[in-house]
Regions:
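Binuclear metal-dependent hydrolase catalytic cores
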Residues: 1-126, 185-207
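Cap/insert and terminal regions of metallo-dependent hydrolase folds
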Residues: 114, 131-207
Length: 207
């Protein structure tokens, strides 16, 4: 969804291990990456390139690039209004990727923020990704969502939604909203109006 290390910190290691162990010795394919062209450039140039480009030259005698590690699946631009939304079908899964307003603190809207995305899966499940409290975004997807997973800090935060802000939402939204990306001590707080805290390591299956 975006380039902070708590979201991409393992990508370099995963890609290198796959190239030099998985592909070389275990007959594994390249990793599949669902990513649009604007974010691929950001991810490679600003985060991954320094640790991945110089490990060898490829079959064409060039230093390694993004496509040497990943089979890329491109979303298509669905709309730019009221915010940028991309979509892609991967197997039986349909995914929308929508811009969020996460960073910098001073960005007044998703259009003026650095590239960060949230997900809407199979026209059913909303995953906010990292975002400030953005009522416009929530209202765009709330009526279409069976369940919602939303970024939540406990105290006011300049780049994340916080619990007091999310508690201003109507019951028909909060009762289907799980809170995620919360600090370790968050569960000491009462959230009876919400669906619950999203649990680390838990697989959620929606029939």
């Amino acid at each position: 969804t975006h380039s902070h290390s708590d979201h991409i910190g393992g990508v370099e290691c995963l890609a290198l291990m796959n190239r030099y162990v998985g592909i070389k010795f275990l007959d594994k394919p390249k990793l599949t990456m669902l990513i649009n062209e604007p974010y691929e450039k950001v991810l490679w140039e600003m985060s991954l390139r320094g640790g991945m480009e110089w490990n060898e030259v490829n079959g064409e005698g060039k230093r390694l690039g993004f496509s040497d590690f990943f089979d890329v699946v491109r979303p298509t631009l669905k709309t730019s209004v009221p915010r940028e939304i991309w979509e892609v079908n991967y197997g039986d899964i349909h995914i929308e990727l929508f811009l969020t307003n996460h960073i910098p603190e001073q960005a007044p809207s998703s259009e003026e923020a650095f590239i960060t995305y949230g997900l809407f899966v199979d026209n059913r499940i909303f995953i906010s990704g990292d975002t400030k409290f953005d009522r416009e975004l929530i209202d765009m997807y709330a009526s279409r969502s069976e369940w919602m997973f939303h970024d939540s800090q406990i105290n006011p935060n300049p780049v994340h939604a916080c619990l007091p802000e999310l508690k201003t939402l109507p019951k028909e939204i909060t009762e289907k909203m799980f809170l995620m990306h919360y600090p370790d001590n968050a569960q000491a707080n009462a959230i009876d109006e919400f669906a619950g805290w999203a649990q680390q390591g838990m697989r959620y299956i929606f029939d």
